Amino acid sequence: MKESIKQLILGGARRAFDKGLLKSDEFPGMEIEAPRHEAHGDFSTNFAMVSAATQKMAPRKIAEAVISCMDSDSVIEKTEIAGPGFINFFLANRAWYPTLDRIVKEDDRFGSSDFGAGKKVQVEFVSANPTGPLHVGHARGAAVGDAVANILSFAGFDVQREYYINDSGRQIRTLGLSVWLRLCQQLGREVEFPTDCYQGDYIKEIAADLHGKMGRELSEKDEAEAVSICAKFAAQVILSGIRADLVAFGVEYDQWFSEESLYASGRVQKAIEEFKARDVIYEKDGAQWFRTERYGDEKDRVVVRNNGITTYFASDIAYHMEKFDRGFDRVIDVWGADHHGYINRINAAIDASGRQSDQFDVILVQLVNLLRNGQPVAMSSRSGEFVTLKDIVDEVGKDAARFLFLSRSYDSGLDFDLEVAKQKTSDNPVYYVQYVHARIAGILMKAVSEKVLNEAEKPGAGNRELLVEPEEINLLKILAAFPETVEKSAATLHPHVIFTYLMGLASAFHGYYNRHKVITPDRELSRGRISLVFAVKTVIRNGLNLLGVSAPERM
């Protein structure tokens, strides 16, 4: 619809120029938006204002000239000039009816597009160290990353999902030491357990498992070798749990990429040597430093310590070089908000390598405040007591968890109330939206049982010309906006845009259903309304699918 209006405007502007009503045939880009207030029409454009400088005319005069020369269009009821020169368009009801045909035809592809033109995009998300179970913060990142990937794919991008396994470095060594010390305790040895080791019962459970498998054998090895064995075993056990928890949350990856493989393949050392040759890495105080300040970071960063051990930054450089070497047009990382300071140094590495940092995006996911009946849930990472992703899914279910994690922009902190997530009332957003889908499924079954529809008939063939109630036209307008909403969500990388849309559509349907019966004594009117609610059901399902939430037929 926006494209049709754009062509109407441009056609009118060209004819106005030909008639001498405009001074230039160069027309700058315009915006066409749905106004906030219904009184301002269905669409509004700033064409006259952005053309004022080129035309050297007052915007309202430009608007008058364009409107006077526009072709008549059967779906435009009237146009108005508002304020400094906005052109407002009021559409006839019949303008919205073709949306129903399109929804029936496209079905589960309605809302999809070629916006991404097949460009290759990698979305790397969660990527938690395999040193403990995924917690509530990881859960929000998982919901965001997976939804972003779904939306980009639906919008025509070729998307790859990846999990980066931090299976090398100090934290893995600390994990191994933590398990080894717990195992020693289980062997009856007196050991001191440092506070910087990993706490929590899961460490004791891994130690007990390892004790049962090879406790005697381990006890005969020197500590360094025993710690290394414990580290590998523990990381595998934890990673297996992470995989299972993510699958239960509806998240699956195309690739799990090991940090250790970067060292084994020599890619880390190769990256360091490449940057040395570019004079981007230099030596100072026995360490090797990356000139990140040259590329916009606040200071230079160490890549190899004076003891010869590489930093995490070194492997991160190699990893991001490897990503671009795989041919991705765009790389998106989903990080916790506490990694904000890391963005500039990765951008610096990308720019220094000769690649383009504008092809690299970081989504920073803010913290989750976990509540129960409005009261904070106590958590302590130091004591190892925290609410895991598995805990949340077990208590409230995948659908409620994902939907609530996506209910606000990831730029903002989120209050997640476990009790609200379990409610089967309109106070629970996921129930509010899913209930629309289930209710319409019930309406369609009733329509078949009452012979309003044939069982084999697609419920979209009704007479839509009978849809004239204000609530019906409002629903049609909301349905027509879904493709643009998906495109906006893809362009901004903000999945909460889909959440907000679904809540609005659900609210409009509930309002309509409370005022009007779908199945009435008038069979033709009933069939028209069935076409409408079937379209609502389809779009609710498509939107929920993008967020990784199911659309139940019964509730």
Curated annotation (Swiss-Prot):
SMART domains: Arg_tRNA_synt_N, DALR_1. Keywords: Aminoacyl-tRNA synthetase, ATP-binding, Cytoplasm, Ligase, Nucleotide-binding, Protein biosynthesis. GO terms for molecular function: arginine-tRNA ligase activity; ATP binding. The keyword Repressor does not apply. Transmembrane segments: none annotated. Pfam families: Arg_tRNA_synt_N (PF03485), DALR_1 (PF05746), tRNA-synt_1d (PF00750). This is Arginine--tRNA ligase. It comes from Desulforapulum autotrophicum (strain ATCC 43914 / DSM 3382 / VKM B-1955 / HRM2) (Desulfobacterium autotrophicum). The lineage of its organism: Bacteria, Pseudomonadati, Thermodesulfobacteriota, Desulfobacteria, Desulfobacterales.
